[in-house]
Amino acid sequence: MTQPDTLTVDLSLLQSVLAKYAGRRREALLPLLHEAQALYGWLPREVQEAIGETLRVPLADIHGVVEFYSMFYNEPMARKVVRVCMDPACHMAGGAAVQLAIQERLGLKPGEADMEADIAYELVPCLGMCEHAPNALLGDRPAGDLTPADVDAFLAGVYPEPEPKIYGGPFIKLTRAGRVDPTSLADFEKYGGYDGLRNVMTMSPEEIIVQLKGSDVLGRGGAMFPVGLKWEMARQAPGEPSEKHIVANADESEPGTFKDRALMEQDPFSLIEAMTVAAYTVGASNGWIFLRGEYPRCEKRLRNAIDKARAAGYLGHNILGRKGFNFDIELRLGAGAYICGEETALFEAIEGKRGFPRIKPPYPTTHGLFNQPTVVNNVETLAAALSVIGMGVNQWRKLGTVDSPGTKWFCISGRVLRPGVYEVPFGLTIRQLVQLAGGQIGDEIQAVLVGGAAGVFVGPDQLDIPLTYEDAKAHNFPLGSGVIMVFDEAVDLHEIMYMLSRFFAHESCGKCYPCQLGTQRQMEILERITYHGGPQPSDRADLVDMGLTMTETSLCGLGQTAATAILSAIALWPELVQPAGRVNGRLR
């Protein structure tokens, strides 16, 4: 931690902020760091010391947390940061030209800051706006569909903010999106908001769990764990725990994933209602939304929704007049660490620590947040549970297939004419989804990435596979977070593979060696293949060996899936990593 010897830090600016946190402990560290950095633009040693004294956290621990999260700064930094996406969807949409235009306009290279102008420039992983590629953030102002001609307006802060693009149907979980004012509780109520909560309060928790089990709703974040079973396990947690928690995992950070942002921006009250229903069912009194730091509009709308729900009696003590039904929600903002999407790393982050994953067992339903019973669900999963309660099991099961009932949100991006979030029943094929998105831009589809950066590539001969849990299992590919990223014949797959490997090397927390070393070496090999001379004879064997080692020995899901897409590409197109293979990573 270095800073100029002559720098004077005015701690009087911090006193009113520290006063709000008097009596709090380490669990308040992340929000306090965010508030302090908003004052100073960075986190000087003196500020960290004052925070440590307030929360009773050692300076070394605070420094470790600041170093862990990419959006916190230990050294002087400009207050306004331009963050430009450098991942596949933006790359395919002309992101490099936008990056160059911003560099020339600012006179900065990536990672540099103009302290006099108080502005910095960074290239960052996916910002979760892939339907608006290329995209960027100017401080807390998002912008999408950028071209070099838009850069002046973007940097001036007058370029329009993008709205989620939502398509498909029938709309079940996104039925209000685009139809209501997302800042208005009255509008939400007018279109059926909180009818679900009132309905469940006429039922016993056991009856709700029976409904969820009958619906076969599985986790929508990738793990596919049955929701009814998870809620039941937390409700029945042994030992009469004093507190239970509901956690919404809104740390949506995987390249190509942007579905949860659509709900949080367009219908934020529904997430609050769904969490409250979960709390009633499980017997929880504490709710937490862990939101990625790069979603500023979601943050504003969720805070507004929480405040208005609390003021109207939908949160707090004796909710809707029910004595003893006490539940409240706190929004926690992340700071740029994909690993915090792993549920136990998320717990560590909320508790004010570095986001290292925990060893399991024990599992969250008995030993989760603060070592207490916890239900942690993805945003779409909570929306699905609320939908089942609202429409009933029989109506829910009329959609989709027998083994995959209901609807799913798919994030369609890349080389298609109409990228966006598509809510559709389970059972459509990959080809049908691509056609729904207007079809591919080029003459033919070269490949599709299914399930996200941690998913798999499929070739043109696999486009007629239905998107269901049973078909995904039969064909050995994950639905994951619902990513469908399309690559036509113009795309260099070498570049895409390198970008995926770069993402995981950047996001590995470093706790376990297989992931820490494997992701770095995987990236190095693919960078050389793509940009510095092409494949060597040993590359295929080395990549497969490293990939399998990471898959089998890494501690958490990040390392276990960091090579999944790469291994699938090698299996389909071994010539990509062999000498005299594909020309420029494209089909011959």
Task: Describe these PLM feature segments.
Residues A274-A278, P425-G442:
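Short amphipathic, charge-patterned alpha-helical segments
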Residues E299-F426, Q440:
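Hydrophobic alpha-helical positions that pack around
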Residues R198-G239, K398, E423, L449-A474:
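Accessory "access/gating" subregions that flank catalytic or transport cores
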Residues V158-G214, N377-G392:
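Flexible inter-domain linker/hinge segments
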Residues T2-V82, M86-K165, D195-G214, S242-H245, ...:
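Ferredoxin-type iron-sulfur electron-transfer modules in oxidoreductases and energy-metabolism complexes
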Residues L138-R141, S413, L417-P419, V450-G451:
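Short strand-turn-strand beta-turns centered on an Asx-Gly dipeptide
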Residues V180-T183, F188-D195, I246-D260, P364-F370, ...:
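Gly-rich Lys/Arg/Thr-decorated short loops/hinges at beta-loop-alpha junctions or inter-strand turns
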Residues Y69, D267-T281:
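Histidine-anchored nucleotide/phosphate-binding helix
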